């Protein structure tokens, strides 16, 4: 009973084996055989991108992510293994942060250097200004000291000219007293207008030569203006009279000394004013000795 069934199965197996043999033979005829040019092109392609050809750890999912991101250049680790897109992006962002931090650190350092330089320049300017100010103050102090010394010398010169008739010198205890005496000397000349130098010297207890020197010094200081004639009289000229003389010369243009002298009596008062010397006793009045019965 099993005999016919066994023969049938064997027949089917033979038919299947023959079918597979025919299919394999057809597949060999379809696959082209690579020629020498194709082999050279394949070898060149392997040399151009050996990492991509030998990269077996790269998955299809990572290839899809790289294609979606549009990355043109792949990143590799220190072992030459190609990195995934996510990891490569993280490394790239980390590198960018590091570069930005370095740039910011350099900018801060440059700002600190610039600030330090500006601070040093400011200190130098302040030191120069302080030195200039110190020199100006020192110069002003020297000028003030020179002025004080000059005034002291003038005062001592004034004081030395006044003498007392009895002892030959005046003991001045205070500057105010000497200044008061000097003012009295100037005022008397101005009020007297024309004064005999000998009388002036005798009244103030001075020598005639000291009186002349004192008047010359006062003229140099601008406190007196006048002239001394050949009779030993000093004629004080006021500012108003000087102004009149200047106007006269300007009106006349060129003028000779003779013309000026001829008009001096009109321009300058030469009359002596009746002013009593301080401390002088008034002259006794004339007494009529005639008596009436």
UniProtKB/Swiss-Prot annotation:
Subcellular location: Endoplasmic reticulum membrane
UniProt keyword Signal, yes or no: no
Pfam families given in the database record: DDRGK (PF09756)
Keyword Acetylation attached: no
Residue ranges, Lumenal side: 1-6
Top-level division of the source organism's lineage: Eukaryota
Region of interest: Disordered: 30-151, 273-293
InterPro entries: DDRGK_dom-contain (IPR019153), DDRGK_domain-containing (IPR050899), WH-like_DNA-bd_sf (IPR036388), WH_DNA-bd_sf (IPR036390)
Membrane topology: Single-pass membrane protein
Cellular component GO terms held in the UniProt record: endoplasmic reticulum membrane
Transmembrane segments: 7-27
Basic and acidic residues compositional bias, start-end: 90-126, 133-151
Keywords: Endoplasmic reticulum, Membrane, Transmembrane, Transmembrane helix, Ubl conjugation pathway
Topological region Cytoplasmic: 28-293
GO molecular function, one term: ubiquitin-like protein ligase binding
Chief location of this protein within or outside the cell: endoplasmic reticulum
Protein family membership: Belongs to the DDRGK1 family.
Record PANTHER family: DDRGK DOMAIN-CONTAINING PROTEIN 1
Function: Substrate adapter for ufmylation, the covalent attachment of the ubiquitin-like modifier UFM1 to substrate proteins.
Protein name: DDRGK domain-containing protein 1
Species in which this protein is naturally found: Monosiga brevicollis
Organism ancestry: Eukaryota, Choanoflagellata, Craspedida, Salpingoecidae, Monosiga
